[in-house]
Amino acid sequence: MIRDAATAPPRASFREATARRRLLGLLDPGTVVEALGPAERVTSPHLAALGLPIAFDDGVVVAEGRLEGAPVLAASGEGGFMGGSVGEVHGAKLVGLLRRARRVRPRGVVLLLDSGGVRLQEANAGLVAVSEVMRAVLETRAAGIPVVGLVGGGWGCFGGMGIVARCCDTIAMSEEGRLGLSGPDVVEATKGVEELDASDRALVWRTYGGKHRFILGEADLLVDDDVAAFRAAAVELLGRPRPISEATLAREHALLAARLARAGGCADAADVWRVAGAAEPERLPLLDAAAFRAAAGGARRALAAEGAVAEEPLGAGSAYRDPGLDALFPRGHTVREAAGILRGSGRAEGGEVAVVGSAGGAEVGVEAALALAAEVLRVVREHPGRPLLALVDSRGQRMSRRDELLGVNGYLGHLAAAVELARQRGHRVVGLLRGDAVSGGVLPLGFMADDVDALEGANPWVMALPAMARVTKIPA
């Protein structure tokens, strides 16, 4: 272990600071004890094998220290190394930190997130690493230890780490921070510039930026781009835990359903703000953080107000007939399919098994994530202890400007939390990959299971080749 008593200078930009400088500015001076620092030289074996640059800390600083005198554990991602992407070693350091938290029980865990998501050069090793981080965050919360996410770095927080952020108890963002699932470059490369113009910076920040995420309810605090402001936010949010419970997730589900009902038809952040009742939404982007909080508070509360919404965002669907499912349940099943999403149950030798999942390469958007979470929560509520089979055949998250505008990463984080609640309540969860299993289509469901199995021909992968080529700058 390495001790470092350095401190961040006053009024230091969070966005421009390095990962280590952010962490040192967050924690009390002289209390930081870093684990597996650069001197340990724990590096990615995959990058070395590919002849790519390595970092001696693999792009993440993990440490323990004190925050206003209280013991905390913290991790800070380095966006300057491979865009803060998470590979096998990077992910293992985060998982180890979260497991240590459950053992030593600090005041909480603070994650300084600056990441483009899965390290594409490590492919499925990175995908599995992110799924393990997601599960570790939820297990730490379930153990009664709050996890706070801070998003204000230059790379934002995207991909699987965008879901990880929404698995935290609470999030603080700056205006400059960005949070989402599919980044603007990925959406443009996959769906075209007509769907989302990644070069339109104003549009990108209206869609992903801290101001929109604050009104939407995806961020709990909006702060200035200042290390000290993020430190104060961490102190405040550690005192506002959201335990993983049936009541907490039921309320979160109602809020997400109300958001979809109210803002589902909006095409731009200004439209969302207008629907929420914000006065002069066009001028909100021009305000500083303090003025924005004052002007947008009413809209934030209005958008978060619970209301009467449809319980079935996809409809009831129709009976699902599939030889593979018939073979799994020769005694019969009542599984129904709607827009490629499966819900129902099957009769096994040991009793009834709940079934949720995807079929036919379905893309998972906000409606699908909400429907899957509703089914998992219904099983927990109505059928205590019933085993849960998560079937996955999905080309991943639906890549659209609308889904990112609504915060699809938050809907998928909610689904992951619902699966974790089922596990905590004694439901055995088994994931079965039957076809494509891509990114957001597998992370919050299949990879959250107690056991994950794959049928012959199943194809877990990270991202479409054109988008990977654009992000990595490596020709497809």
What is each residue range found by the language model?
Residues 58, 86-106, 338-342, 365-385:
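A short, well-ordered alpha-helical element
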Residues 111, 149-151, 355, 390, ...:
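Structural beta-sheet core signal
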Residues 67-91, 345-369:
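STAS-typified acidic loop motif
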Residues 51-68, 333-349:
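N-terminal short beta-loop-beta anion/metal-coordinating cradle
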Residues 105-122, 383-403:
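Short, glycine-/small-residue-enriched flexible loop/hinge segments at domain edges that mediate gating
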Residues 117-249, 396, 400-476:
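Conserved catalytic cores of soluble enzyme domains
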Residues 1-36, 188-342, 470-476:
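Amphipathic alpha-helical segments at domain termini/boundaries
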Residues 142, 358-386, 417-427:
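A structural preference for long, well-packed, hydrophobic secondary-structure segments
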